[in-house]
C-alpha cells in the first residue's frame, strides 16, 4: 500500500513524504536528525512550498534525472531523494549518505524512479 503525507504546503508547491507499506522513511530520517538539521530541512521545505524550485541554487535542490531530485542537507552530507509530479508536487522518498568524491547515485536514482512508477500504478499522484 502506497500513500503520501503532506509535510508543507504553500502557494508554489506541496512537499510530501512517501509512505510504503506503512513505513515513512522520510519521517524516520527527519526524526533521526539533530534539532539544527531538522530546522534546516524545515526551512528548505517551507521555502519550496512558498517559492517553488526557482527559490534555490542548484546545490540545495537539484534535479538529477527526469523527475528525480535531491535535497542536500548541508550538516551531514546526506541527500533526501524525491520526485516531482506535475507542477505542484514534490514527494520525498528516502535519504542516503553521499558517497565520497563526485559520484552519481545510480542505485538511489533507480529506486526513486521505481517508487514514482509504483505511485503512478496505484493512482496516488492523481
Give a label for each model feature.
Residues 1-77, 86-90, 97-126:
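Basic, Lys/Arg-enriched alpha-helical interface segments
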